[in-house]
């Protein structure tokens, strides 16, 4: 956190500067397999099971595997391509893959977290609870469906084209909890969902290919559409949306959106004014409804 100026100034340097070490333990088991038939058809798959002290103790989630499967078809090795005399087509391959990958947020813990400090005024020890325990802490999962193609023409032009859909679930986001538990009525839990759809194109052309010299031009383009599909907790104060945009999300918006008031100009006294949630022009200090702010970018 950020300490107040008075608090920081009055503390000795040895109390402010500190070094700490953080250690986590992992154990993994994985399996990979692949098979290619007649240099034309290929299948591959992988499975991985991982355990870490960052996961919760709930047995329902502890041993969920991450896995992927894929297939490819090397069209240029088919007889009908060779019989057609398509010498200009050096390589053309189609690919299809599907899999589930995982990510673990090391800022969260399945255990009750607290930090210890000494009061500036009483010199007494203070312990502040940070996060409640979470036995269901688990992977942030992303399922990816990808269709792609690779090609080479005339021995000089190479490229690839991919279309994908990525759906992320069990994302760590703020979740509403019983206010009587404390923690500002919210806690981080695997409760968010997000979707990405996009395309990627990559091209490369060899203008000059010599033993000791080459000249190549490359081109890449990509498009991605992102949307938050599920979030359990939405703030009730517009200021929270602007102060902490990376901790507060609105369903239907994009990830890491930035929010702002709709500016309505200056009042007769020179003070700034904005539009509230109903479109009325009022003083900026009076607007606290989250529906009064809009997404202005990322």
What is the meaning of each model-derived region?
Residues 1-262:
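Extracellular/periplasmic, surface-exposed regions of secreted and cell-surface proteins
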């Amino acid at each position: 956190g950020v300490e107040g100026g008075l608090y920081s100034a009055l503390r000795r340097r040895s109390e402010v500067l500190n070094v700490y070490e953080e250690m986590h333990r992992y154990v993994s088991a994985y399996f990979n397999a692949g098979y290619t038939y007649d240099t034309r058809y290929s299948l591959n798959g992988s499975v991985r099971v991982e355990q870490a002290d960052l996961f919760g103790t709930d047995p329902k989630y502890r041993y969920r595997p991450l896995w992927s499967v894929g297939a490819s078809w090397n069209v240029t090795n088919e007889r009908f391509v060779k019989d057609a005399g398509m010498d200009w087509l050096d390589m053309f391959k189609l690919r299809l893959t599907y899999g589930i990958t995982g990510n673990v947020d090391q800022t969260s813990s399945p255990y009750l977290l607290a930090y210890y400090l000494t009061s500036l005024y009483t010199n007494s020890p203070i312990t502040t609870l940070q996060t409640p325990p979470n036995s269901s802490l688990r992977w942030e999962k992303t399922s990816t469906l990808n269709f792609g193609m690779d090609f080479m023409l005339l021995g000089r032009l190479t490229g690839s084209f991919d279309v994908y859909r990525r759906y992320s679930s069990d994302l760590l986001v703020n979740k509403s909890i019983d206010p009587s538990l404390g923690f500002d009525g919210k806690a981080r839990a695997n409760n968010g969902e997000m979707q990405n759809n996009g395309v990627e194109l990559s091209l490369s052309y060899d203008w000059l290919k010599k033993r000791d010299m080459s000249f190549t031009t490359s081109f890449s383009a990509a498009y991605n559409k992102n949307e938050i599909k599920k979030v359990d907790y939405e703030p009730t104060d517009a200021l929270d949306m602007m102060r902490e945009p990376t901790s507060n999300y609105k369903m239907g918006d994009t990830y890491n959106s930035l929010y702002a008031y709709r500016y309505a100009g200056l009042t007769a006294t020179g003070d700034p004014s904005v539009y509230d949630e109903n479109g009325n022009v009022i003083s900026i200090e009076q607007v606290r409804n989250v529906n009064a702010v809009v997404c202005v970018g990322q």
